[in-house]
Amino acid sequence: YWELVSDVPAGKRDTFYRFYTHSDLCALCGRLKEIYQRYDSLEDALAASSYPNPVFKLQDLFSGINGIPVMGGTSACKRLAMFLRWMVRTDGIVDFGIWQTVFHPRQLIIPLDTHVHQISLELGLTQQRTATLKTALEITEALSHIFPDDPCLGDFALFGYDINKGK
């Protein structure tokens, strides 16, 4: 990752992407380097974590890295949930399904954004008024009654629900 540091001109290191600085990217790459020095894969590192769900496992591994929500915070952890969905689910369209050994789709948490939260409130899938991880877990639990082996299957339906309203 040190090559990455030296390749970016000093005057261009303030902002790397949106809310992240060059230093943030270097910290993330540094943590990945540590993980890959200790484990054969990120999947193996997550398997070694004692936390109960995949999002907590990612938060544990990347604790202290800017852009990774802290455990117990108010974030819905949408990016982490989305990343895990891409890596675990095997729909052949959007999700890569690269990780086949550590997690099962039934363990995933729905990637929760404002739109999906509002639709979930409207449909009675949650009573939570704020989009937090607790809310995402509640919606995922509700969806698990419809899609027991893959609650995130309902994500596309919720995301697209009402999209053409008013047209």
Where are these regions (language model features)?
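HhH-family (HhH-GPD) DNA N-glycosylase catalytic core used in base-excision repair
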Residues: Y1-K167
